[in-house]
Curated annotation (Swiss-Prot):
<feature type="active site" description="Nucleophile">
    <location>
        <position position="261"/>
    </location>
</feature>
<protein>
    <recommendedName>
        <fullName>Uncharacterized protein APE_2601.1</fullName>
        <ecNumber>3.5.3.-</ecNumber>
    </recommendedName>
</protein>
<dbReference type="InterPro" id="IPR033199">
    <property type="entry name" value="DDAH-like"/>
</dbReference>
<dbReference type="GO" id="GO:0016597">
    <property type="term" value="F:amino acid binding"/>
</dbReference>
<dbReference type="Pfam" id="PF19420">
    <property type="entry name" value="DDAH_eukar"/>
</dbReference>
<dbReference type="GO" id="GO:0045429">
    <property type="term" value="P:positive regulation of nitric oxide biosynthetic process"/>
</dbReference>
<dbReference type="GO" id="GO:0016403">
    <property type="term" value="F:dimethylargininase activity"/>
</dbReference>
<keyword id="KW-0378">Hydrolase</keyword>
<feature type="active site" description="Proton donor">
    <location>
        <position position="171"/>
    </location>
</feature>
<dbReference type="GO" id="GO:0006525">
    <property type="term" value="P:arginine metabolic process"/>
</dbReference>
<dbReference type="GO" id="GO:0000052">
    <property type="term" value="P:citrulline metabolic process"/>
</dbReference>
<comment type="similarity">
    <text>Belongs to the DDAH family.</text>
</comment>
Amino acid sequence: MVGMGDRLFNMVFTRRPPQSMSRCISDPGYRAAARFSYEEASAQYKVYVERLHSAGITVKELGPLEDYPDSVFIQDTAVIGGGSRVAVLARFGAPSRRGEEGHVVSILSSMGLEIHPVKPPGTLEGGDVLVTGEGVVFAGLSSRTNREGVETLKTAFPNVNVETLNAKGLHLLSHLGYLGKATLISAEGLYDKSIFKRHGFDLIEIPWEERDAANLLYLGEGRVLLPAGYNQTRDLLEQHGFRIVEAEIRQFMACMGGVTCLSLPIYNIL
């Protein structure tokens, strides 16, 4: 049963999509999902922001960065702790994205946060960091994040248990999500349930063909922001008592992005 008052964050940053997003990092399988349209991407971004506002979340919108085609995926730039007043500043594993993080430094500094930058040879992107409300943070090792980067995360947030596992996708959050109340979601057979069970987490498994739906955003109080078009996942979550809000983000999924990628939360628990 889903509880109340379990929201992980009350405020997020978002960044408007640049026209250069047509040159985003992707692969043919994802690129085929949608022909790029700046107008359509902008409209989908606007609806996404409206969904967050409707859930009572404060959204601070930042302007587009034309020099960085993937910059709309602002989640990757940092991991921000609202309780500790600490932020880990990313060092991108994707060389073409290095420099994006510099555009959030002044914002983090203006908030009075203690900034822990990931230093070479470390790499860490926010999409590999799954924060939960149970004092456990799952950090994914991927082509974008390495062990040195995760060590920076552990040092910055000693108040939580940072557990490392191999990401089964571009990022850990590509196919693994958090649903509140010690519950995770992923595609069937993708992760060994025992990895999470030993930390007290249940795992809801969705059909393999809808694995991208696991990149969802838990809004608290049983509400889930889900990418549109994943009907089996929506029905399954509703059976578990969740209230589903959908957002069409096909333009961003064509760039291998998802619901979590489009916002940078200030986590209450960190």
